[in-house]
């Protein structure tokens, strides 16, 4: 009888171990489901971040395109202004190459200077009176 008791005791301990293994398997599957749920949440967060980055990238691209158009317009206007300035400089060169033109330019400059002096004197007199 002692042998049967020992046999039953060893059998019980043997099956208790299997019960523990089966529970472990259940725990493993529960842990697997938990890990899957965590992975799904992480994937959703990643998708949200990717879509956010995609929107930001689109906004940046649109802003860059707007700035490129603006820079093109500014560049075209600068080229136009450069052309006008070079034409004006060429005309001044033509005027100052001839002596008669040089004399008339000096005369005009003296009149402009005289006009400015008179203007400031009149303003000064009005300031003193007022």
Curated annotation (Swiss-Prot):
Q: Name residues in a coiled coil.
A: 40-82
Gene3D superfamilies per the UniProt record, alphabetical: 1.20.5.110
InterPro entries found in the cross-reference section: BET1_SNARE, T_SNARE_dom
**Entry's Gene Ontology BP terms:** endoplasmic reticulum to Golgi vesicle-mediated transport; protein transport
Membrane topology field = Single-pass type IV membrane protein
Q: Where in the cell is it found?
A: Golgi apparatus membrane; Endoplasmic reticulum membrane
Q: Which family does it belong to?
A: Belongs to the BET1 family.
What is the protein name given in its UniProt record? Answer: Bet1-like SNARE 1-2
Question: Taxonomic lineage of this organism?
Answer: Eukaryota, Viridiplantae, Streptophyta, Embryophyta, Tracheophyta
């Amino acid at each position: 009888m002692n042998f049967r008791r020992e046999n039953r005791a060893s059998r019980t301990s043997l099956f208790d171990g299997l019960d523990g293994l089966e529970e472990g398997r259940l725990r493993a599957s529960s842990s697997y489901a938990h890990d899957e749920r965590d992975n799904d949440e992480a994937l959703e967060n990643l998708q949200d971040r990717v879509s956010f980055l995609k929107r930001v990238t689109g906004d940046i691209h649109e802003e860059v395109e707007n700035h490129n158009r603006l820079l093109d317009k500014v560049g075209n206007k600068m080229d136009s202004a450069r052309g006008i300035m070079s034409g004006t400089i060429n005309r001044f060169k033509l005027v100052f190459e001839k002596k008669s033109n040089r004399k008339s330019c000096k005369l005009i400059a003296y009149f402009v200077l005289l006009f400015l002096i008179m203007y400031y004197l009149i303003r000064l007199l009005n300031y003193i009176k007022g």
